[in-house]
Regions:
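Class II aminoacyl-tRNA synthetase catalytic cores and aaRS-like
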Residues: 2-410
Length: 410
């Protein structure tokens, strides 16, 4: 990082609470009874303030504290990230730094000696969900997700009912036994929360097993559209669009790992996921919410937000200059070109029913600093623990942490 002109600066550990997406860890303030410090979930606001103060390239190995549930790639409590920010920078500038820094490290110190070379592949969020069923696809797997919604329209099979999205994952030359298929489908249902279906193509080109009986009148059409041949196994998912996509993504990964010849495991395959939606409809609230980082610059700036406010543009069609770095199906980091203009920031929050007073109350230091003028800036923060997990070839992050917490954060 220093070779790229970055200056290492440490930011405060005892700070004020700020909405970052998880719950805070609080520390009582001895001299101020009834008040608390918060441990930082990320140095997000601090590093943006550094850009405003004239430090054009910052980095640190930043400790982050989040009270959130454990996962295979997420340890509860604390973790570390290679936090960086660049002034007068674009998305491409951020990509260029990490594409130069990371591959040599992974090739030299990783369990596998092959790593993607620059430039990393770029995939839009929409294409990632449509093609891989995931916004963190494992590109070592050569299987893809196909849409078969129109192909099964009018089917008597209840999950294919009108309004549902139907996805398929085709595996050529698959000799998986019925018992193994049942176990794989059960594992997918546990992980995705939705049941997958399946059928096979026999030597005569007929559909057999699973849900084949519901597709007999559409055999020729489905065969042509999906490119099926004798010996193919077809995994199928159905449901609301996002649920069907995500279940297909889990199914794709499980099949790629289970069926020989479809996963080149001994390599590090990086990619960028770009063009994330700025907004989404909240599952619980049913109202418009930020999809990811509220500090991201919308693609189209103030003009696109004003059009959305007037009803000329659907807010769900607004994209953010946000990106994720993914390696072997693991999200290493999220980053963004930041929203450095207070007018655009306020307008972005107004679309989710928060006004200027709310922005000032939630982000007073950053809002005030931006009012004096801030340079365009962008950044990212790859997770150090996750990188070490990949370097060591481990599937669980707790295996590489010297004193890890358990799933109950103990």
């Amino acid at each position: 990082m220093t070779a790229h002109g970055f200056l290492e600066i440490t930011t405060p550990i005892l700070t004020a609470s700020s909405p970052e997406g998880a719950r805070d860890y609080l520390v009582p303030a001895r001299k101020h009874p009834g008040k608390f410090y918060a441990l930082p979930q990320a140095p997000q606001q601090f590093k943006q303030l550094l850009m405003t103060a004239g430090f054009d390239r910052y980095f640190q190995i930043a400790p982050c504290f989040r009270d959130e549930d454990a996962r295979g790639d997420r340890s509860p409590g604390e973790f570390y990230q290679l936090d960086m920010e660049m002034a007068f920078a674009t998305q491409d500038d951020v990509f260029a730094v990490l594409e130069d820094v990371l591959p040599p490290i992974f090739a030299k110190y990783g369990k596998y000696d092959i790593a993607s070379e620059a430039p990393f592949r770029r995939i839009s969020y929409h294409d990632a969900m449509e093609t891989y069923g995931s916004d963190k696809p494992d590109l070592r797997i050569d299987l893809t997700v196909q849409d078969m919604t129109a192909l099964v329209a009018g089917s008597d099979f209840a999950p294919f009912a009108a309004g549902n999205t139907v996805k398929a994952v085709v595996v050529p030359d698959c000799a998986m036994a019925r018992k193994a298929v049942d176990k794989l489908c059960a594992d997918v249902e546990v992980q995705a929360g939705s049941k997958p279906y399946w059928f096979k193509v026999d030597e005569q080109g007929n559909f057999t097993g699973g849900i084949a009986k519901f597709l007999t009148d559409k055999t020729a059409e489905i065969t042509a559209a999906l490119g099926l041949k004798p010996g193919c196994f077809v995994g199928v998912t159905a449901g609301k669009k996002t649920a069907a996509q995500k279940t297909a993504g889990v199914l794709r990964t499980k099949l790629g790992m289970a069926v020989p010849g479809h996963m080149d495991k001994e390599r590090y395959e990086f990619c960028w996921i770009v063009d994330f939606p700025m907004y989404e409809i909240g599952e619980e609230s049913g109202e418009l919410e930020f999809c990811h980082n509220p500090f991201s610059m919308p693609n189209g700036g103030l003009e696109i937000l004003e059009k959305a406010e007037r009803g000329e543009v659907d807010p769900l069609d607004i994209y953010a200059y946000q990106y994720d770095l993914v390696c072997n199906g693991v999200e290493l980091s999220s980053g963004a070109v930041r929203n450095h203009d207070p007018e655009i920031m306020v307008k972005a929050f107004e679309l989710v029913r928060l006004g200027e007073d709310d922005v000032k109350a939630k982000f007073p230091a950053m809002y005030n600093a931006f009012c004096y003028g801030a340079p365009p800036h962008a950044g990212i923060a790859p997770g150090v623990d996750r990188m070490v997990m990949l370097l060591a070839g481990e599937d669980c992050i707790r295996e590489i942490i010297p004193f890890p917490m358990n799933k109950n954060a103990q």
